[in-house]
Design a protein with these regions (language model features):
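Expand to "…catalyze enediolate/carbanion chemistry for C-C bond making/breaking, isomerization
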Residues: 1-157
Length: 157
């Protein structure tokens, strides 16, 4: 299996350079499958507080119009109130939406209650994952604390 390559579009500069990015992918026959629009970083680069902002939606629609043969996935602070944003983009060709840990293929027929359920499940999974990592790394940190004390005592003797 060939790895799937994605390109993050997460800044005002990336949006500005999208034509040259897409041309390079095409000219060099790069195995890029998808563009991933990161609304959080994109909105920060534009100094826009709300990722649901109309300007962010317009930028996303513009990127979808230029996508060529690539899929486009959207992420960045997805929550239940993101449904109208995702729904509007689904009608323009959005392939998928994602949280940091879960990706969902979209469709024009996606219903609000299904979307809310998917987002809640994804966020619950991510929260469980983070708590698991925190517990695991906390235990590792305790082991390292013991090793640090052992080495420090060796250096003193």
């Amino acid at each position: 299996n060939t790895p799937k390559l994605f390109i993050n579009i997460e800044s005002q500069l990336a949006v500005k350079n999208i034509d040259s990015i897409l041309k390079l992918i095409e000219d060099e026959n790069l195995p890029v499958e998808s563009l991933v629009i990161g609304r959080s970083d994109l909105s920060k680069s534009l100094k826009i507080v709300d990722v649901e902002n109309k300007k962010i939606l317009e930028i996303c629609i513009g990127l979808l119009k230029k996508k060529r043969n690539l899929n486009v996935t959207l992420g960045g602070n997805l929550m239940n109130k993101s449904f109208p944003f995702i729904s509007a983009l689904s009608k323009k060709g959005l392939y998928a939406f994602e949280s940091r840990k879960c990706t969902f293929k979209t469709s024009e027929s996606l219903k609000k209650h299904n979307f809310n359920s998917l987002i809640s499940t994804a966020l619950e999974f991510e929260l469980s994952w983070l708590n698991c990592k925190k517990n695991l790394y906390g235990e590792r940190s305790k082991e390292e604390d013991l090793r640090i004390k052992t080495i420090e005592s060796r250096l003193k003797s």
